[in-house]
Amino acid sequence: MKPLRKQGIIIFSILALVLAACGGGTTEETVEETAPEVVETLDSPAVTTAAGVKTGVGVTSDPCPAEVGGVPTMADDSKGCIYLGMLNDYTGPYAAVAPALETAQRGFWMWVNSTGGIGDYSVVIREGVDTAYNPQKHLEAYNAQREEVAALAMSLGTPQTLFILDEMDKDNMVGAPMSWYSGWSYKSVDRGLVVEFGSAYCADGMNALDWAMASLPVDIKTIGIMGFAGDYGTDWANGIKYAAEKAGVTVAWEYLPPTLEFDVAQAVGLMVTQPVDAYFPAVGPGQMAQVAGGAFQQGLTPIAMMAAPSYNDAFVAEGFALKPLFESGTMYNMAWVAPYEADTPAHATMRATMQAMGLDSASSFLVAGWSSQYHLKGVLEAAVKGGDLTRAGIRRAAANVYVESDGMMLTRELGQNRADKESFIGRPDGSIGSGTTLLAGNYVGPAADSYDWNGGPCS
């Protein structure tokens, strides 16, 4: 799929009509002015409707541009503008999925702008900056945008976001992550700056094992774990090991090298020399296809419970050599949200927006991009309600606020110091646009249910 900026001019009337059909539309309302509530600490967000809104870096009284990088914004030229930053991977290991993530995020704010915006403001994402999935380049990209934005629409990667957290702290810069590290749910780690969404890798790992044991016609006694150390692999592995201990399952091997040191041959070698009933990969899509294919060539087809970043709907596209393997009933994928076709108001709005933009993809990475913005939207709305759209005000709003997503995810209280534990589990299926048939939604197995989520992150 091409980046949104290369899609050309979008027909605004079509988008407006489709959004109206989904219930969108701007309505006028009268708000009684009240005195703003005084906020003393970062843990006490403003919750009153203020007479005026204090603004700072990245917020202007001037309207948003009509387009950014050739992409229409649907901004209201009678309103001010909230600018968001984007730290994406255009040239690194996730370059192939970066366009879908960006497309969905820009589409999300187009929808928000076309249905009333955030108070007296429209919202736009500035041109994305390439991080190459490298922490140092991530910092350089952050520095390139830090004086121009009120918050980050995306900071892709767990180690990368951790690497810039000190700078975000100095700037009171709140951001939506494109990762599901359990630490994002705890102020001891994220300092109240990362607006998390969806279940953590750790919970998905627990639920993956428990669901497989309860639902599949395989007696799972031994398992293997592979992933990227220091990235999502560690969080995922710790969840699986906790569930394995609870269930009396033997972890025969773990292969968790740093991201750039992952060796497909070594991973396949472990599967050959130490066969297991099931393995749990938390790698990138490229490594996933190579590992699964390599094991298959050796006559091995154990159950595979893939972490969300491991799966790509391209695995079940017509013409892909491993399509039969991924659809064989031995491969399953985890997610923090239901796939593209799900029946929720949020999914319907997303589909309508993507279709109006001329997109025919149902990629899970579109869902990832879209879902990542809901909680940030809730934070900005709370900041406006509190009368403070400075970065400090946005940070206060993120410290303790209920956020919802029109049914895409469960309502969540940010700042609760407790990670979400509900997972979605699917089966690769090329007959469906998203490439996934949903088998279980908001699933919580016995391990995740018994785990002390108030005790801090899993890794």
Model-derived features: where do they sit?
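Extracellular/periplasmic ligand-binding modules, especially the Venus flytrap/periplasmic-binding
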Residues: 229, 237-241, 285, 290, ...
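Extracytoplasmic ligand/sensor domains, especially the bilobed periplasmic-binding protein
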Residues: 69-70, 149-255, 303-328
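Bacterial signal peptide processing site
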Residues: 23-26
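Beta-alpha junction/loop-to-helix N-cap segments that form part of ligand/metal-binding clefts
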Residues: 69, 96-103, 115-188, 197, ...
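Extracytoplasmic "Venus flytrap"
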Residues: 60, 67-79, 85-106, 128-135, ...
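C-terminal motif of bacterial Sec signal peptides marking the signal peptidase cleavage site
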Residues: 18-21
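Extracellular/periplasmic periplasmic-binding protein-like sensory domains
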Residues: 295-370, 455-458
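Solvent-exposed, acidic/polar segments of extracytosolic/periplasmic ligand-binding ectodomains
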Residues: 42-75, 80-82, 401-459
